[in-house]
């Protein structure tokens, strides 16, 4: 049991200075003043700090991405403390380019491991590839019968994409949609968007030709070039959900793109931010040769949030929505996740006056305290 005293609560909307009592992995009470006399209750002084929902990063290569530069460029698996020190208490894992030396089986095993270590984890079946790599040989069965799997990954308009036809894209989306309905899950298609000239055109075409709801198809990396970004804004205006990626280009940071989106009357609730953490970033020349590559960090999510507040003048409560409540609603786990409310999961961050992460609580357990790692993942300290 944990009692956080005298803390400024952002749910993400500002609630004022409160006391927050946590027990059994849940937020039990949020009141002006809570006093319990019990040695079993851990007291945390929240004076001068902000209490926010834990960040939800819906695009992380938890088993490592990369591989486009041969075997030596396969990125490593992520560790628990890399996520918690970045304020991430819920993560969605997925594969990337490589569905050949990587597998959905390994992805689900890693998801299970991170869950055992204390955070909340979901996953998507598939990779860039088509036919889709799965665990059960069926998109529908993966989503229906594997607890962690809530959707499917596919790539579009990219030189690494499988160049699916509109009919094939329809079938993937239909399978995800129906499986989600049958299992009570989002049943979404996370669509990696590349630099290809077609952009979102295939998506627009299949939505016009079918009854597939817009919410089923979630394009990500849409801030990688101007034309794609404008297409994505139109998509979000029409009711679709779009995901902006941290660290793509200086002039296309998520915060700057959201500023533009709001000026163009794009509904803010249809925009989310993710890190693409532990995926590789790569640069290619005009002939398609790999020139440079590296690995993205999950800490970019927290850094982007800070920049939005400190450099771009977003209010704390507004900047938080793009990494908490908007994401939770899109994943259909709100209000269990993504907010600070009585009855919600106790996934909480304490931020200091500089918005740096002081304390992280995941499912009611203290993972980081006073900027010190309390809980490490298996083998992290070897």
Which residue ranges define each predicted feature?
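Active-site gating loops and adjacent loop-to-helix segments of metal-dependent hydrolytic enzymes
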Residues: 66, 70-73, 78-93, 142-157, ...
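His/Asp/Glu-enriched, well-ordered alpha-helical/loop segment
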Residues: 264-349
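Divalent metal-coordination and catalytic microenvironments
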Residues: 7, 20, 25, 48, ...
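Histidine-rich, glycine-flanked metal-binding segment
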Residues: 1-2, 9-52, 373
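C-terminal cap of metal-dependent C-N hydrolases
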Residues: 7-9, 24-27, 339-382
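Active-site core of metal-dependent hydrolases
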Residues: 160, 168, 175-282, 290-291
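Divalent metal-dependent hydrolysis catalytic cores, especially in the metallo-beta-lactamase
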Residues: 78-103, 109-131, 146-162, 181-195, ...
């Amino acid at each position: 049991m944990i009692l956080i005293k005298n803390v400024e609560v952002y749910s993400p909307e500002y609630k004022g200075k409160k006391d927050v009592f946590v027990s059994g992995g849940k937020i039990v009470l949020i009141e002006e003043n809570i006093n319990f006399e019990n040695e079993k209750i851990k007291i945390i002084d929240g004076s001068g700090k902000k209490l926010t929902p834990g960040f939800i990063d819906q695009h992380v290569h938890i088993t490592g991405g990369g591989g486009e530069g041969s075997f030596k460029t396969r990125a490593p698996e992520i560790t628990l403390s890399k996520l918690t020190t970045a304020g991430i208490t819920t993560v969605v894992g997925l594969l990337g380019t490589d569905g050949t030396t990587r597998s959905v089986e390994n992805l689900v095993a890693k998801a299970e491991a991170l869950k055992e270590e204390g955070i909340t984890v979901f996953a998507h079946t598939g990779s860039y590839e088509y036919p889709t790599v799965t665990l059960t040989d069926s998109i529908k069965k993966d989503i229906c019968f594997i607890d962690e799997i809530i959707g499917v990954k596919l790539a579009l308009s990219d030189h690494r994409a499988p160049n699916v036809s509109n009919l094939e894209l329809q079938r993937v989306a239909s399978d995800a949609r129906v499986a989600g309905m049958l299992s009570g899950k989002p049943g979404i298609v996370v669509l990696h968007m590349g630099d290809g000239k077609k952009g979102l055109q295939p998506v627009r075409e299949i939505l016009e030709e079918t009854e597939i709801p817009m919410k089923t198809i979630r394009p990500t990396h849409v801030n990688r070039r101007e034309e794609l970004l404008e297409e994505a804004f139109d998509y979000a205006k029409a009711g679709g959900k779009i995901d902006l990626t941290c660290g793509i280009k200086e002039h296309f940071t998520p915060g700057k793109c959201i500023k533009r989106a709001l000026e163009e009357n794009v509904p803010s609730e249809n925009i989310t931010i993710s890190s693409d953490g532990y995926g590789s970033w790569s640069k290619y020349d005009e002939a398609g040769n790999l020139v440079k590559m590296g690995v993205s960090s999950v800490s970019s999510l927290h850094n982007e949030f800070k920049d939005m507040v400190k450099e771009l003048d977003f209010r704390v409560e507004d900047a938080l929505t793009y990494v908490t409540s908007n994401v939770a609603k899109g994943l259909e786990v709100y209000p269990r996740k993504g907010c600070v409310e009585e009855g919600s999961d106790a996934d909480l961050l304490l931020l200091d006056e500089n918005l740096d992460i002081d304390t992280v609580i995941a499912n009611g357990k203290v993972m980081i305290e006073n900027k010190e790692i309390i809980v490490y993942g298996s083998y992290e300290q070897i």
